[in-house]
Amino acid sequence: MLGTLFGSAIGGALAVAGAPVALAAMGFTGTGIAAASIAAKMMSAAAIANGGGVAAGSLVATLQSAGVLGLSTSTNAILGAAGAAVGALL
């Protein structure tokens, strides 16, 4: 039981703390999309596919928003719950 609680706590904390780190590592930073990053390649591909612009609400637009503005409280809650569930299983 204690191991499950510990795993849940660690999993939840890692998910919430790791998401912004993962976004930044992909190139979705607080100042926008980093040059020559995975995010830049994703944006280029999305723009080409959409005839020159990135569609509002697309994956790239959503990740860019999360990179600049941060994750919402509800998103952090969902990430925490998912991380806790995975942590409890491990």
Curated annotation (Swiss-Prot):
Principal location: nucleus
Membrane topology: Multi-pass membrane protein
Domain of life: Eukaryota
Gene Ontology CC: nuclear inner membrane
Transmembrane regions: 28-48, 67-89
Effects seen without this gene: Homozygous knockout mice exhibit no obvious phenotype, having normal growth rates, survival, fertility and litter sizes. No organ pathology is detected. However, they display decreased restenosis, the narrowing of blood vessels, upon vascular injury.
Signal peptide stretch: 1-24
Record's keyword annotation contains Transferase: no
Stored InterPro entries: IFI6/IFI27-like, IFI6/IFI27-like_sf
Keyword set, alphabetical order: Membrane, Nucleus, Signal, Transcription, Transcription regulation, Transmembrane, Transmembrane helix
Subcellular location: Nucleus inner membrane
Induction: Up-regulated by interferon. Up-regulated by vascular tissues injury.
Pfam families xref list: Ifi-6-16
Any single biological process term in GO: response to virus
PANTHER family per the UniProt record, alphabetical: INTERFERON ALPHA-INDUCIBLE PROTEIN 27, INTERFERON ALPHA-INDUCIBLE PROTEIN 27, MITOCHONDRIAL
Function: May be involved in the interferon-induced negative regulation of the transcriptional activity of NR4A1, NR4A2 and NR4A3 through the enhancement of XPO1-mediated nuclear export of these nuclear receptors. Through the regulation of NR4A1 transcriptional activity, may play a role in the vascular response to injury.
Subunit record text: Homodimer. Interacts with SKP2. Interacts with NR4A1. May interact with BCL2.
Similarity comment: family membership: Belongs to the IFI6/IFI27 family.
The protein's name in its UniProt record: Interferon alpha-inducible protein 27-like protein 2A
Organism: Mus musculus
